Amino acid sequence: MANDYFFTSESVSEGHPDKVADQISDSILDAILAQDPTARVAAETLCNTGLVVLAGEITTNANVDYIQVARNTLREIGYDNTDYGIDYKGCAVLVAYDKQSPDIAQGVDKAHDDGLDQGAGDQGLMFGYACDETAELMPLPIHLSHRLVERQSQLRRDGRLNWLRPDAKSQVTLRYVDGKPDSIDTVVLSTQHDEDISLEKLREAVIEEIIKPVLPKHLIKGAINFLVNPTGRFVIGGPQGDCGLTGRKIIVDTYGGAAPHGGGAFSGKDPSKVDRSAAYAGRYVAKNVVAAGLASKCLIQISYAIGVAKPTSVMVSAFGTGKIVDEKIAQLVSEHFDLRPKGIVKMLNLLRPIYKKTAAYGHFGREEPEFSWEQTDKAAALRAAAGL
């Protein structure tokens, strides 16, 4: 990639139909883990006009009212009015869960004496990434995109812009010079709204109250192209506007396209699924490498075979920014991080009901107390081991 370029990332609000599905799936996962931390959960959700469908594979001793969990999640998001196309009180909720396949379970359940050789729940490849563009060590375009839709939600919830509805999308284009963020070029924000708000009033309020407070002043170096509700109308939204499905916002969930993605979604999956747990571990590794000053950006790829605990491969790239060679960073990673599935669960304390909070506004780059994968507690040891 050239040193001078434009790069774009997007995010969506908690009321976006795919994020509604993600939050229902993770709310169900949390409700199960609260009673049965070793449950096997793969909870998928579909939501459409007036309808929620819950399907997947769950093996648990927990007693959970899945229908009520789904309704509560819709209520918390703000779908409490039939005008919005789905109302938590009156929507239909269908439940169709099976148990985990015994063929899969036999590969995951086996463990040796130390209990840490539990096999991976599936084959696959996962990526972790960090860079020094923000204090949170995240790419700036996805960071700003998340903050925009978070602010839309905040102003909707506190009533300052009481004509806002739950569904919204953001998109930020930055200009990079010498590989670093230089200026903001374009901001797109589309937000669902009540029928009686004029487009002129909406655009002015969105730019002044939502967008401008989020943008870093040092990146405003000329006229920014603001595109607010460019279709002119966004009354019909949420699950009524589009059918929502779990796992369809995997780039929003991660790095906004700034790093590769292995393809596996997160929400609704318990930590035995390496799609989720190994991606969290990859973020933990990459963030600690950058926090340690070993590199200004770091990408890690981890791969697994089903039923096998040890990763089939681990790759580290610092994109030429490393203070030491990539092979040495990879060696330090293997010495300081246990990337077996059960080792990850133990290292990051993942058998907790912490996942609903991850299901909107990004799984990474948020300083939430539950997000153990955002800690930089290994940075000092890595730096010392590297001799820096």
From Swiss-Prot:
It comes from Polynucleobacter necessarius subsp. necessarius (strain STIR1). InterPro entries: ADOMET_SYNTHASE_CS, S-AdoMet_synt_C, S-AdoMet_synt_central, S-AdoMet_synt_N, S-AdoMet_synthetase, S-AdoMet_synthetase_sfam. It catalyses: L-methionine + ATP + H2O = S-adenosyl-L-methionine + phosphate + diphosphate. Its cofactor is Mg(2+); K(+). NCBIfam families: metK (TIGR01034). This is S-adenosylmethionine synthase. Its EC number is 2.5.1.6. Gene3D superfamilies: 3.30.300.10. The keyword Nucleus does not apply. Catalyzes the formation of S-adenosylmethionine (AdoMet) from methionine and ATP. The overall synthetic reaction is composed of two sequential steps, AdoMet formation and the subsequent tripolyphosphate hydrolysis which occurs prior to release of AdoMet from the enzyme.
